[in-house]
Amino acid sequence: PSFAIKKHDDLFIYLSDRLLEENEQVRKVARDCLRKVAPIFPSGCEEILRRELRHEAKQHRNDAFATLKETSRNWVETGCLHLDELIREDDVDLRRRGAKILRTITAKGGATGWDLITWSLQDEDAQVRRSASACLPALANVESRVATILVESSMFDEDSGVKKNVIKTLKTLDMESPRVAQLIQDGARDRDPELRKACINQLSIILTGDKLREVATELLRQETRPELRTRLERLSRDVDWEGTEEEKNRALAPLDKVPEEFSEIQSPEI
């Protein structure tokens, strides 16, 4: 790389040729060189990397994707360019490998990165969708509105890995958003018990008073799991009116603690 900065004429052509050598050791050294050079000269290595990513040999492909991941950290635009092509490939291995790199461009990829995640969340392959859904928690930290839309479209995915990432993301979204509040109420009715549990636990954050009790009572009619029924029963009751003595006392503010020096002072005798 340092030599290429000073004199780069034809160097990338030589590198490309060495990657096609018959000798495996030569190709190995050339792949190592590409991994060092591509993050510095992404445009000069673009065609070489594009070819290596689709190489039939597993080791070539492994090294190429490792190179793409490092390049994406330095040059988000280059990462998005290659990923945009990879997630459209018919070869599911390319789509799976590309989806795993999406997290690298999530924070800085902007609208292009969001589109790549969206397309991958709609892929027919569960592993691709799972890798794309792993981007959602990080996306929620930089663009909560977009993350909310993607969570909404992925919440009822049949894959357990996708749902796990959706649940993780739900806890980081803006709870004051009406859209998020509706998402949580919908999730509390889902067939998946883990998703229901996560959403039921969020109800007391997005709802209060009569509305909370009304929703909890409605959910209680269809909930079958003992653990979740117990939780909903507590949410559906007005503790001030229907709670036990212990529950009512628990809601009262505790008395201020009396400092020791005052507690030791004896009352004056009369």
What are these model-derived regions, one by one?
Residues 22-23, 56-57, 90-91, 124-125, ...:
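Short inter-helical turns and helix N-cap capping residues of alpha-solenoid HEAT/ARM repeat scaffolds
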Residues 6-18, 40-52, 74-86, 108-120, ...:
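Amphipathic alpha-helical scaffolding segments comprising HEAT/armadillo-like alpha-solenoid repeats
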